A protein has these predicted regions:
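Active-site rim beta-loop-alpha module in soluble metabolic enzymes
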Residues: 69-145
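C-terminal helical cap(s) of enzyme catalytic domains, especially alpha/beta-barrels
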Residues: 62-67, 168, 180-196
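Glycine/small-residue-rich loop that forms an oxyanion/phosphate-binding "nest" at active or ligand-binding sites
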Residues: 12-65
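Short acidic active-site motifs
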Residues: 28-29, 160-161, 185
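Glycine-enriched alpha-helix->loop->beta-strand junction motifs that scaffold or abut catalytic
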Residues: 8, 37-41, 72, 167-174, ...
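Glycine-rich phosphate-binding loops at beta-strand->alpha-helix junctions
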Residues: 152-161
Length: 196
């Protein structure tokens, strides 16, 4: 039922500042997020990287302050259409992971959002999503000594493809963008989602 699914949800934010508190217009401070019992923060989204020139180092600083304050960062990674086509996408993604994520963590959540799929209505094939998931998980385990990793997919996720992507790609969840601000779409996703 929808009520049961609502109880499974929690508060998350779309970004934060890398200092604990202060006057950072347009950014949420960790102190405020804690006051609202925020459990997750999305960091390194492609729009933040593009519009605000956010770097991997900035994402790493934000991730560190989140972890120090009991908030789980969701680290976004993903490639452009050009990188996908020229075959350099995996090196690009793993470099983002290398530079954004600290070693020796108990748990990491990575959201794979191919930039070419965001808002375009196009999504990679499930086998392509799985390839990225497998390489990221292997890299986190072998190069970063991460104990547990969760993998989310984001990029043109909507009520028509949510279950197919989550089940078909063996993702642990989705980063829903444009569809999340459309009441009818997000209600359909929540109502029809196969959480088994």
């Amino acid at each position: 039922s929808l009520d049961r699914r609502q109880r499974q949800m929690c508060i998350r934010d779309r970004d934060c500042h890398y200092q604990l508190n202060g006057s950072f217009t347009g950014d949420s401070s960790i102190t405020i997020l804690k006051d609202f019992s925020c459990k997750y923060v999305i960091l390194g989204h492609s729009e933040r990287r593009s519009y605000y020139n956010e770097t991997n180092l900035t994402v790493k600083k934000k991730s560190k302050i989140c972890r120090e304050n009991g908030i789980q960062p969701i680290i976004c990674v993903g490639e452009s259409f050009i990188r996908r086509k020229d075959g350099s996408y995996m090196n690009f993604i793993l470099n983002q992971i290398e530079e954004c994520i600290e070693p020796n963590l108990d748990e990491v959540i990575v959201a794979y959002e191919p930039i070419w799929a965001i808002g375009t209505g196009e999504t990679p094939l499930n086998k392509e999503i799985n390839e990225v998931k497998e390489k990221i998980n292997l890299f986190l385990k072998n190069s970063k000594n991460v104990k547990s990793a969760k993998f989310l997919y984001g990029g043109s996720v909507d009520s028509n493809n949510f279950n197919e992507i989550i089940i078909g790609s063996d993702s642990d969840g989705a980063l829903v963008g444009g569809a999340s601000v459309k009441e009818e779409e997000i209600t359909k996703i929540i109502t029809n989602a196969d959480f088994n």
